[in-house]
């Protein structure tokens, strides 16, 4: 939720960046769906995976919880993979929905939860990763 709040604040303060379609634009409902899909569907299992593989000491990790989270994450990414068929970004043009979900997809791929069969999602992660601002942000020390 914090990511969503942060990104909503940035969007309101920097309207000229055109990272969100006008509410009258036909792509606005899809934009809202994908903007919030990240926090509602993708990040909960990502958080569980990080807790079970990084944050908890090995003796407190739960392989069942980890396995369930990985399966859930892969399932949550299936609609994203389908939506990206024939397009580079979620609503056509790059938007704040891609900022939200793009990072989550990048991390999901890094965690090994994006199978090769999800070729649209693999391509999307490559597109997001090639953006200079993403490269700068992900490699900050």
Q: What is each stretch, according to the model?
A:
Residues 2, 6-67, 71-74, 81, ...:
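GST-like domain detector, emphasizing the conserved glutathione-binding G-site
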Residues 3-4, 98-99, 131:
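Short, thiol/selenol-centered motifs that function as redox-active sites or metal-ligating centers
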Residues 13, 17, 57, 86-87, ...:
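Alpha-helix C-capping/helix-to-loop hinge sites
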Residues 30-33, 98-99, 103, 123:
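Amphipathic alpha-helical interaction segments
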Residues 41, 45-50, 89-114, 128:
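GST superfamily/GST-like fold recognition
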Residues 55-60, 86-96:
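Acidic interhelical loop/turn segments
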Residues 82-93, 133-137:
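Surface-exposed helix-capping loop/turn segments at secondary-structure junctions
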Residues 117-135:
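C-terminal end-helix/capping segment
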